Structures are given as structure tokens and as C-alpha cells.
Amino acid sequence: MANKQITLYENLRACSYTPFYLAQTLGFFEEEGLDINLQLSPSPTETAQGLIDGRADVSFGGPMRVLMHHNTDDNCPLICFGQVVARDPFILVGQTPNPTFCFQDLIGPKIGVATDVPTPWMTLQDDLSRAGVNPNSINKSVDKTMQEHTVLFKKGELDIVQVFEPYAQELLESGGHVWHRFSTRGDIAFTTFYATRNFVNSNRFACRSLIKAINKSLNKIHQSSAAEISDAIRPFYFPYLTPNAYENIINRYKDSKLWPKTTALPVESFVRLKAALLSGGLIQKDIPYDRIVDQELSGPEGE
């Protein structure tokens, strides 16, 4: 019997998505009876809208986008399943060392905030508020991409930048210093699969196969060296990185517990993300977990 074909939208190219790339290069999807047509989404907005309009079957990205759609449409068909990136992959990089970082240190310096997608600022502003710092009090640059902020940081025009990998690695190589890893916040359901409820219900076995493949990938990541993972992925997805650079990125993310042991999607992780989006005003409705997440499908053992 031929494998089930699935068009899978990749939200954007990022090192935090390593489990997806590993599942593709090592053939885990194929082992589970899937023929994956992996397409890089033209934009983060399209990653969700393309599912609704039928241009893709499944996407991987942040539940934030699904929450935004449900916030404006009570009949939104999108649903998440499977936590693949559990923690926040973003990092604060500063021009000078700051081994005793606290959020009050962000009052004053010029900060390049990541606004390529909404979640990084939403979670940062929530962290600031919880630490007693008014998010409006910081001197932030928000009208440029992470790539542009990286260039400005190297020129000395920004004191701090909020970036994910591989931008952080690039800045560390050029003399920057890690101030803070947002992964220390704990699990926050940063990245999942999502699809329309109709697709999930009509293709339950295929969605279950996606989950099985990613659990294989997560297990492989936790059992393998950074060099082994890099060798399997880098030539295909990050050829511009040196082996040492990608290995450093993988080790930092593994040390940060960015990738969970399994795809189970706990209520607590979802609630922590939702709280940040509510506090930042990105969403106004307190949308229930069961409306957004297919919990039974998410677990490693299935239904």
C-alpha cells in the first residue's frame, strides 16, 4: 500500500525545529507510512491560513497562531496536537558580559526585540510584568527583523538583541554574550503540529503517524551526540553553518531542555503560553485547552 501523502508546512527555517528535520532526514515519517511533502511557508501568517484554505494539510509552528484565529472566530476549525518544542528558544545577547542578569537590567539599554512573529515579545513582556518591570519602560527597537537586528548589534547600534538560533550563535562568535535564555521560564508549548479539525478527524491514522515519527525523533535527539544530529541535518537544512556552530546550537538547546522527552502536551504548558498572550493583549478571550488541543492524539502512546 502506498504511503499517505501529506503536505506539511514548515513555519520558518529555525534550529529549534531540529526534531522535524531529523524525522525527515532519517526517514521516520516514511517508516510510519507517510510521504511528507515539506514546504516552507511563504509567511508565518500563511502557515495557519493555508490550512483553512486547503493549501496544506498540516503545519508545525506556535499554538499562538491557532489561539489568534480562535480569538476572532468562535468557529475556527484549527486544532493543535503534539508538543515538539516545549520551551522558548529565544535568547538575549548583550554587548558585554552580565552573569547576574535580572529583568530590571533591560531598563535603559537599547534592545532589538524579536517581532518577526508575535510570541517572543508577548512572552518577554509577560516576563517583565511578572518581574515588576513595566514593558513600556524599555527602550526597544521593533520595526526590524532579527537578521537586521543582528547586523545593527554587530555595528554597535544595539546594546541587546532578542534572537533565536542560528542568530545567537553568529553573535556569540562575533563577541556577544548570553544574558538570558528564555527557556529558563519552563515549558510553554512553544511549537506543535496543527491542522483543521476536519483533517484530523478524517485522517486520524496519518496524524497519529506524525506523532509516532516525532517521538522517534525526540528519542533519537536525547540519545545522540550533537555531532550525530548535526551530520544528519546540517547538509540539507543549514548548509551555511559550520559543523561546530550547529553542534554548539544543539548542545545549548539540549542543555536548555528545549525539546521534550515526548509529544505529550500538558495543560500547564498551554496555559502558560495563553497567559502571556492575554497579558500582552494579543488575544482577549480565555480560550479553553480542550478547544485548542487534541490531548488524546498528542501523547506518545496514542488513543
Please identify what each model-predicted range represents:
Residues 2-133, 140-143, 159-165, 179-181, ...:
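Short, glycine-/small- and polar/acidic-enriched structural segments
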Residues 274-303:
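Conserved C-terminal helix/tail region of periplasmic/extracytoplasmic solute-binding proteins
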Residues 24-25, 30, 129, 172, ...:
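Short polybasic/polar patches that bind polyanions
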Residues 56, 60, 154-155, 254-267, ...:
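Short amphipathic alpha-helical segments at helix boundaries and their inter-helical linkers
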Residues 148-238:
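Pocket-lining segment of extracytoplasmic ligand-binding domains
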Residues 202-283:
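Secondary-structure end/capping motifs
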Residues 108, 173, 294:
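Phosphate-coordinating loops and pocket residues in cytosolic domains that bind phosphorylated ligands
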